[in-house]
Amino acid sequence: MYKKTASVLILSTILLAACSKEEPKAALDCAQPATLQNIRTTIEDTLKQQARSFARNDNRQFVDADKIIAAGLELETLLEDPKETEDNGKAICRANLKIRIPDTILKTAIDNSPLIYGNTPLSDMLEQKLMGSNLIFENNTFSTTLLYTPDKDGKPVFEDNTLSSTAQTLSATLLPYGVKSIVMIDGKPVSKEQAIKLLQNQNTEEPPTV
């Protein structure tokens, strides 16, 4: 009787020990194609919203929103070194986001910036927006770090607003690219080059806040 009872107790202990062991969690798939596609969609949607909002509110009508939207399709967006890491005991994905603006697009934005940002150079505007953030702009490229967790469909759930703030800064950078070739100054059509010269020599109308 004792041996039988002891055997039952031993078996129960083994079963309980087996049940109490936690099954190892599956590794996060941080490099799913859906992640990069989601990022690109977020950027393109933000560009579209910001460009249309500015064009709608600017009574000077200097900007063609469609030009900015088209420029967004030419951006080179990369997600580098995606890997699983841990944040406060939670398994998450970490990756480096890089968004490169083509040379011709950035040059046009810089040239047109006086019609949008007045006497503030595009580089100074960017410096103000980057201050205090983990976003870097160098060699035509925005760089930052994203933290996210893939959902059951592989789409990323981001841990903070880094992506949205990056997209907004990118939108502000590309906004001057959308300046029309011919704009209206004092009711007269002039080339954007002439408009820049005119506006640099006088106080410009305050543009909508970007």
Language-model region placement:
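Bacterial N-terminal signal peptides
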Residues: 8-14
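Short amphipathic alpha-helical "recognition" segments used for binding
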Residues: 7-8, 210
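Bacterial N-terminal signal peptides that target proteins for export
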Residues: 1-7
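Cystatin/cathelin-like cysteine-protease inhibitor module
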Residues: 20-210
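C-terminal motif of bacterial Sec signal peptides marking the signal peptidase cleavage site
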Residues: 16-18
